[in-house]
Amino acid sequence: MAGFPLGGGSHSRDNPAPPVPPVHPADAASFLYATRGGSFQLWQQQEQQPFYASNIIRFADDAPPAPSLAGASSSSSSRGMRSSGGGGGGGGGGISCQDCGNQAKKDCTHMRCRTCCKSRGFACATHVKSTWVPAAKRRERQQQLAALAASAAATAGGAGPSRDPTKRPRARPSATTPTTSSGDQQMVTVAERFPREVSSEAVFRCVRLGPVDQAEAEVAYQTAVSIGGHVFKGILHDVGPEALAVAGGGGASEYHFRLTGDGSSPSTAAAGEAGSGGGGNIIVSSAVVMDPYPTPGPYGAFPAGTPFFHGHPRP
């Protein structure tokens, strides 16, 4: 082995050996060192590990350091773990804005947030106009809607009090009082249509009441008048002599045919008027006279089917 003294210590002191050229660590992996006792010792050279810290930020423009052969596997594995962890974090947090660093919109092709995208003037369809309305404008809008609802309710309900259109109106039972008809009300209704007492001029026809084969039948007078569009007809029965009627509290004037109506009549004076001596105020009214005889006359205006009694006695 050239370059190493193999002799004793005296020989080395008297004849010094020539200097040994330096050996590069890559050319020799081990060195032999001589001790003072003359023996040799083999020493393995330790490789220098590159200094690397996982928490140091490395920029994209910087070139990565060249790892040694021994630490290539460990650095590559650490980088793989770091890249996988970073990929998981990137998937959860999304992409960052290229200008401000805030979170960018996922579908934005410019990889920027809404503020930076709008400030740069990019025509991005992802960043639409915000629909958020300030509280002051929302309050003003609510007041306008309430005023419109109140005006609509006032227009629909007339002068009634305004109410909230969202509330349901309260159902109020109708306070109706049932009306009952009494005799007094009916009398008032009849009195409004016809006068209470009227003396009328009419024609009376003498008729016989009783069986046909009876010689002495009851004599009565029959008449009919039309007052106010209504036909009134009836038969006046014999109640006895006038003296008895006066003694009983009545007179001939009490048996006048009192009807309701007005107007004039072409008929003759009644038999009761002749008996009473023409006393009392007589109200002339239009009268429809019933003719009991089969001979047609100017006053035969009664409908067919009315029972008539002829005044001719049987032979």
Swiss-Prot record:
A motif (Required for homo- and heterodimerization) lies at residues 227-230. One of its GO terms (molecular function) is DNA binding. Zn(2+) 2 binds at C97, C113, C117, C124. Zn(2+) 1 binds at C97, C100, C108, C113. Disruption phenotype: Significant reduced tiller number, enhanced culm strength, increased panicle branch numbers and reduced grain size. It is found in: Nucleus. It comes from the Eukaryota. Keywords: Activator, DNA-binding, Metal-binding, Nucleus, Transcription, Transcription regulation, Zinc. Residues 70-82, 143-156, 172-182 have a biased composition (Low complexity). GO terms for cellular component: nucleus. One of its GO terms (biological process) is positive regulation of DNA-templated transcription. Residues 1-24, 64-92, 143-186 are annotated as: Disordered. Forms homodimers (via C-terminus). Interacts with SPL14/IPA1 (via C-terminus). Belongs to the SHI protein family. Regulates tillering and panicle branching by modulating SPL14/IPA1 transcriptional activity on the downstream TB1 and DEP1 target genes. Binds directly to the 5'-T/GCTCTAC-3' DNA motif found in the promoter regions of both TB1 and DEP1. Represses the DNA binding activity of SPL14/IPA1 toward the promoters of both TB1 and DEP1. Exhibits weak transcriptional activation activity in yeast cells. This is Protein SHORT INTERNODES 1. It comes from Oryza sativa subsp. japonica (Rice). The lineage of its organism: Eukaryota, Viridiplantae, Streptophyta, Embryophyta, Tracheophyta.
